[in-house]
A protein has these predicted regions:
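N-terminal leader/signal peptides at the extreme start of proteins
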Residues: 1-17
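N-terminal single-pass transmembrane signal-anchor helix
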Residues: 13-44
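Intrinsic disorder/low-complexity signature
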Residues: 2-4, 52-53, 61, 90, ...
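Membrane-proximal N-terminal amphipathic helix
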Residues: 45-74
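Low-complexity, intrinsically disordered/propeptide-like segments
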Residues: 9-11, 25-26, 35, 81, ...
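Periplasmic/extracellular, small/polar-rich flexible segments of pilin-like filament-forming proteins
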Residues: 68-178
Length: 178
């Protein structure tokens, strides 16, 4: 026997991932990341729309509540920095100032979720939602996230319009003053 004196040496095979296995794992991680980014983007877009709709409702409720104060006997409403802005017993034409007061009050309280550095509300209307670039200035009506307030010619209806989408018709609420 020629091999009788040989000491048997066991060579253990090192365990490691092959390059193919590593590439498969990296590809799977990449796919999961891509799906996650798309899902997150959709989630934030939906959240911004919901916040814009909620802000519209808050503005409408605030105006309704303030006008109700006039009906129960308060003489002044629309508090801005500790000062009441509107005289309930004032002239019919003084109602034309209400949109300006509301604009001041809410530009201090809410933000445009799409462009936080610009005012969320402006006086004007009627509006149609469109895709004007933000660089046109914050006073331009009709782009997503903006709220518009106006009053009809007879000073009897306050109109709030909000662009929730970047195109189409705005969400609109009419509030009777009388």
């Amino acid at each position: 026997m020629k091999f009788a004196n040989l000491n048997l040496i066991y060579i253990t095979k090192q365990k490691a991932f092959t390059i193919i296995e590593l590439l498969v794992v990296v590809a799977i991680i990449g796919i999961l990341a891509a799906v996650g980014v798309v899902a997150y983007s959709g989630y934030t877009k939906s959240a911004k729309k919901k916040v814009t709709e909620a802000n519209h409702k808050v503005i409408a409720k605030y105006i309704q509540n303030e006008l109700a104060k006039c009906l129960i006997g308060e003489s002044k409403i629309l508090d801005y920095n500790g000062s009441k802005q509107f005289d309930c017993n004032g002239t019919h034409n003084s109602r034309g100032n209400i949109p300006g007061y509301i604009e001041k009050i809410f530009n201090d309280k809410i933000q445009d979720v799409y462009e936080p550095s610009t005012a969320a509300m402006t006086v004007g209307g009627p509006i149609k939602c469109h895709g004007i670039p933000k660089s046109y200035g914050y006073k331009k009506l009709g782009y997503q996230g903006k709220h518009s307030i106006s009053i009809n010619v007879g000073y009897t209806i306050i109109i709030i319009e909000t662009c929730v989408e970047d195109s189409g018709s705005p969400v609109k609420t009419d509030i009777s003053i009388e």
